[in-house]
Amino acid sequence: LSYCTYGGIPRNKITEFYGEPSGGKSTTAIDICKNAIDIFQKEFDAKVEALRKSAASGNKSANAELQDILDCGPKKVLYIDLEHSFDGAWSKTLGIDETRIEIMQPPDVFAEDILQTIQDIIETGEMGLIVLDSIPSLVPKSELEKKLGERTVASLAGLLTIFFRKVVSLLTRYECTLLTINQIRDNMDNPYVIKTPGGQAPKFYASLRIYFRIGHPVDFLGNELPQSAENPAGYIVNARITKQKSAPFDRKNG
């Protein structure tokens, strides 16, 4: 995927992962969190070293800026787990230290409140990466207050349109990247067209979209097994880039 995306997801932009259940979306997102933590720490250390050299040469403004940066620390990573499926043991297996990542698992909270909280967090300037897992788990107030069987029309789509329109410029201003995870739904009108929840806004505002699906099962040596294999060691994940606005769109399959 790093090769297909020309070095990873675009910074200070919106990226969307979508696809089948157990297709590798959340695992890939956690791996990105791990890489982001290391990158932010290296950038912080390099900036501190440069400012210390500048301050040592008598630059008073550099000394003040150095103190501000030391107070804030490196950019942070926030994982918003609306599905309450984040596994600390699994993330540790993937190489991520739980003490270096912020995990938010809100209870039954309105989608309006969660989206506003994300906007407020971006505006603090402290976050370098926010993962929203997942869009279909956002429940608008109008939907949460209705009984089962009562329908609401495009309430989440309307909320997301407003949200993405507001945060797309904030991400650039505060140097924060937003990674959203989405699911797919059966499309009764056209089974050959993939349908995702949340309306058109997640697709429109994303600079990068990647579609994940499960491939062949494999054994512990990485050899492909028949689809009927009962206890495979894992599965090959097929990822296809369906939108790319931050790099050449010539590497679509990973």
Indicate where each model-derived feature is located.
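The Walker A/P-loop phosphate-binding site
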Residues: 1-100, 118-119, 123
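Residues immediately C-terminal
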Residues: 85, 137, 186
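Glycine-rich, histidine-containing beta strand-loop boundary motifs that form or position
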Residues: 81-83, 134, 182
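Phosphate-binding/switch region of NTP-binding enzymes
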Residues: 121, 153-254
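Short acidic, glycine/serine/threonine-rich loops at helix termini
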Residues: 92, 142-144, 190-192
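Phosphate-binding/switch loop-helix module in NTP-utilizing enzymes
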Residues: 66-69, 106-176
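A short alpha->loop->secondary-structure connector
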Residues: 38, 72-74, 94-101, 146-155, ...
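Short hydrophobic alpha-helical runs that function as membrane-insertion/retention elements
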Residues: 76-79, 102-104, 129, 179, ...
